[in-house]
Amino acid sequence: MTSPPFLGESQTLSKVLTRIEAEPARVYTDESGGIIAINPAFSYLCGYTFDEVKGKKPGAFLQGPVTTQESLAPLRAAIQTRTSCMTEVLNYHKDQSIYRVQIELHPWKDDASTLKGFMAIERKLP
C-alpha cells in the first residue's frame, strides 16, 4: 500500500497518526472564551473538527455530568485573574466516551500586554 501523495515518501499514515497522538492538544480562545484555533491533536483527542467548535466555549461541549466543579475551579480562577494554571478534568469525546485530561491554561497577550485570549494545552491521561 502506498502513502497518499501529501504525506511524502518518508512518512506513512501510521507515523503521522502516532505523531498527532503524542502531541499535546492545543486550543486557543479569544478573551471571551470562544475558540479561534485548534491543532490536529485536539481533533484527534476529542473528535471535533474546527468547524464544529469555532466560536464555542470548550466547556460547552467537552464537559458533562461526571466533570466536577472542583476540577474546573482552577480554570475559572485563572481566567478571572488572567493567570496560568494546571488541573485534571474528566472530559467528553464527541462520541460521549469519557477521558481524563491534564489541562495547562495560559493567557496570551499582545505586545502592549493586553489580554487577547487563552491557550490550553491538553494531555490525555491514563
Question: What does each model-identified segment do?
Answer:
Residues 22-23, 78-88:
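PAS/PAS-like sensory domains
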Residues 84, 98-100, 117:
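Beta-strand residues that line the small-molecule/cofactor-binding core
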Residues 52-66:
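PAS-family sensory/regulatory domains
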Residues 1-32, 74, 104, 109, ...:
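PAS-family sensory modules
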Residues 42-53:
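PAS/PAS-like sensory domain cap-loop motif
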Residues 64-77:
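PAS/Per-ARNT-Sim sensory domains
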Residues 90-96, 109-110:
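PAS-family sensory domains
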